[in-house]
Amino acid sequence: MSTPPLSGPGMGAAAGPGGFPGAQAATAAREVNTASLCRIGQETVQDIVFRTMEIFQLLRNMQLPNGVTYHTVTYQDRLGKLQEHLRQLSILFRKLRLVYDKCNENCAGLDPVPIEQLIPYVEEEYSKHDDRGIASQLRFASEEKREILEVNKKLKQKNQQLKQIMDQLRNLIWDINSMLAMRN
């Protein structure tokens, strides 16, 4: 999980480990665009997470000084590994800062684009160029709404009538039951 070294003006030596010597370094620096810088930054963050997990693994495996004799060789070995991981972590953070600064530098002149414009919007075929179609759709929708309101009004009236009939039947049944109870 290692990332290629970043070379360019202000970003490190032109002929470092894995770098390009001489004129090739200048062309490679020009070819690095913001998207590849973001990819390199993402890989660097992944490396940082991996190294941090290794550091925590080393710390978890270290023995606490609880009065038990500790082998000096083992202690020195683990301490050396821990220091090496911390040094590499520091280098990775510096690399991430360089990538971040370079991305901000590349994007400094760009105007911010509203997020809504970045989302592709597909319009329906009939509504692209036909204003009359929109008017007819609007008219159709208003007629449909008017019809729905009329149906709802009639439905409420019918429900009211049914409620009155049910009340009358309930009263009638109540009266019949009362008369039968008085007869017995």
Swiss-Prot record:
Residues 136-179 form a coiled coil. It comes from the Eukaryota. Keywords: Activator, Coiled coil, Nucleus, Transcription, Transcription regulation. GO terms for molecular function: transcription coregulator activity. Its main location: nucleus. One of its GO terms (cellular component) is mediator complex. The keyword Nucleus applies. GO terms for biological process: positive regulation of DNA-templated transcription. It is found in: Nucleus. Component of the Mediator complex. Component of the Mediator complex, a coactivator involved in the regulated transcription of nearly all RNA polymerase II-dependent genes. Mediator functions as a bridge to convey information from gene-specific regulatory proteins to the basal RNA polymerase II transcription machinery. Mediator is recruited to promoters by direct interactions with regulatory proteins and serves as a scaffold for the assembly of a functional preinitiation complex with RNA polymerase II and the general transcription factors. PANTHER family: MEDIATOR OF RNA POLYMERASE II TRANSCRIPTION SUBUNIT 30. Belongs to the Mediator complex subunit 30 family. This is Mediator of RNA polymerase II transcription subunit 30. It comes from Xenopus laevis.
